[in-house]
Amino acid sequence: MRLNTLSPAAGSKPSKKRVGRGIGSGLGKTGGRGHKGQKSRSGGKVRAGFEGGQMPLKQRLPKFGFTSRKSLVTAEVRLSELAKVEGNVIDLNSLKAANVITKNIEFAKVVLSGEIATAVTVKGLRVTKGAKAAIEAAGGKIEE
């Protein structure tokens, strides 16, 4: 193998479409844009959601509800993710240290998803009924 013999695999680099280069090319004159109209012009794009002057769907539908700011600082933690935490006491700080949750999270809830094999103590976190049963079945406990 030599540098001057290197070439890309056949068909891996298709030649780009050359538009407006004569009738024989099949893409001459109008260049695949058809005749007249906004889309035939340069810069003739229609913004996303524009419906030709008709009231767009986004504006026809009513505003509804809001995004709770508390949800932005709340996280769900799966049972299977508790295994990533070193030590047997699990609280908000230990979850952050193990990169299970991000540093801006202020509230966390343990949910039943996956399995837990080791006995752990969950401190200061909310826990679902199913997760509580699974933690206690593994020999762990929940403290408020």
Curated annotation (Swiss-Prot):
Domain of life of the native organism: Bacteria
SUPFAM superfamilies reported for this sequence: Ribosomal proteins L15p and L18e (SSF52080)
Key word Ribonucleoprotein present: yes
Compositional bias ranges of the Gly residues kind: 21-31
Alphabetical GO biological process terms: translation
InterPro entries on file: Ribosomal_uL15, Ribosomal_uL15/eL18, Ribosomal_uL15/eL18_sf, Ribosomal_uL15_bac-type, Ribosomal_uL15_CS
Family classification: Belongs to the universal ribosomal protein uL15 family.
Protein name per UniProt: Large ribosomal subunit protein uL15
Gene source species: Aliivibrio fischeri (strain ATCC 700601 / ES114)
